[in-house]
């Protein structure tokens, strides 16, 4: 499966830095605003493994479902590694300018609407630059792709820590009712 993934993947990323005020219409929801507290600007990021991975997943699913599940899991890890590498490059660039980044915060996290996905792709010119689009239902295509917003500040920032204390579902969470967490 790893060989298939390596042959099919064409990892690409695009990022744009923007003043927070300039992209405020796309920062909808309390969770993203909390995440960006203390940040005067943002970096928009999109990463994809490319359409070749989608084709490999379709082919695997048609012939061997167990293999397709393994390939899908490997591709999920690979796109996160691609995003991690892009984020580290951005961190290094910002550090040279005396700036610091929060972690990634993606559409669909907390109350940050997934519908923002299409706007982020447009702002990044992602369809042209890396071949990344979204369906009318705001799902990314190719599937193994990530979009995110990172905050930029002149001092170390961490954003709001993920976890039960900051979760919008805290009061009705099925995990918490069972004494567990999703962390």
Model region roles, listed by residue range:
Residues 1-68:
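Active-site helix-to-loop segments that bind/position phosphate- or nucleotide-bearing substrates
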Residues 1-30, 95-183:
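Compositionally biased, low-complexity/repeat regions
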Residues 61-114:
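Long, amphipathic alpha-helical coupling/dimerization segments that relay conformational signals between
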């Amino acid at each position: 499966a790893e060989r298939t993934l390596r042959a099919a993947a064409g990892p690409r990323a695009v990022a744009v830095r923007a003043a927070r005020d300039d992209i405020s219409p796309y920062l909808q929801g309390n969770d993203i605003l909390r995440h960006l507290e203390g940040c005067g600007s943002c970096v928009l990021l999109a990463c994809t493994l490319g359409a070749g991975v989608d084709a490999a997943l379709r082919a695997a699913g048609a012939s061997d479902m167990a293999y397709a599940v393994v390939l899908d899991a490997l591709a999920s890890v690979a796109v996160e590694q691609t995003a991690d590498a892009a984020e580290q490059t951005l961190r290094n660039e910002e550090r040279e300018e005396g700036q610091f980044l929060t972690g990634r915060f993606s559409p669909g996290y907390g109350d940050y609407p997934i519908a923002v996905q299409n706007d982020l792709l447009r702002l990044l010119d992602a369809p042209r630059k890396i071949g990344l689009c979204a369906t009318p239902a705001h799902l990314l295509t190719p599937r193994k792709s990530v979009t995110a917003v990172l905050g930029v500040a002149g001092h170390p920032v961490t954003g709001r820590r993920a976890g039960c204390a900051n979760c919008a579902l805290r009061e009705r969470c099925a995990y918490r009712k069972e004494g567990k967490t999703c962390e």
